A protein has these predicted regions:
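Acidic, surface-exposed loops and disordered segments
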Residues: 1-191
Length: 191
């Protein structure tokens, strides 16, 4: 698959098959973050890998799913939950643009996972105080995001953004995600 094909097909996934993500894929996710570009090569992004079933179960009530959908549609059911979470942590003792470096790391890790057929959901609507305690994250480190991983149990595809759709994703008749995206003409100016 070409890089552009990967970018088109790597969407957010919120329902997963109950199949563990193999350790070699977890290792690729970690390696993708380790290799990430970052400002001044400061490497301030850290990870906490949560892949033991009992630990994954403790994370689940501390994250929120699919803000644009009613919970009964957007929240995965017990047999659709992710089998792996990765906490993305910023080391605030290292100066630099942590937001940009974190964004690059998030892109790398989700693309590395998707290369192996593992879907992901980057989650910012999380209970940071409770997760920080649960995951043993201490100052000067700060929890930024949780990322859910697993083998997708639904499809997701890009649709044109229109006045009718707006930016909100929605489910089609098969419970697959439709993700409106702006046109190239709307996002790029050529001089």
């Amino acid at each position: 698959m070409s890089v552009m094909d990967t970018l088109v097909s790597r969407r957010t996934y919120r329902r997963f098959a109950q199949k563990a993500v193999p350790q070699d894929v977890v290792d690729d996710i970690v390696e993708a973050v380790r290799l990430s570009s970052c400002g001044a090569n400061r490497q301030a992004v850290r990870l906490v890998v949560v892949n033991k079933p009992e630990a994954v179960a403790k994370v689940q009530p501390l994250v929120k799913w699919a803000a644009y959908l009613p919970p009964e549609q957007g929240t995965p059911k017990a047999d659709e939950l992710p089998t792996l979470y990765v906490a993305v942590v910023q080391d605030t003792s290292i100066p630099g643009d942590l937001a940009t470096d974190t964004g690059i790391a998030l892109a790398n890790m989700t693309l590395a996972a998707w290369d192996k057929g593992v879907g992901s959901c980057i989650m910012g609507a999380i209970n940071k105080p409770a997760l920080t305690q649960l995951l043993g994250i201490e100052e000067p480190q700060k929890l930024a995001f949780m990322v859910a991983f697993g083998y997708p149990a639904h499809k997701a595809h890009i649709v044109p953004l229109t006045a009718e759709t707006g930016v909100k994703y929605y489910l089609d008749e098969n419970r697959d995600y439709c993700v409106p995206k702006r046109s190239k003409e709307e996002i790029a100016k050529y001089l």
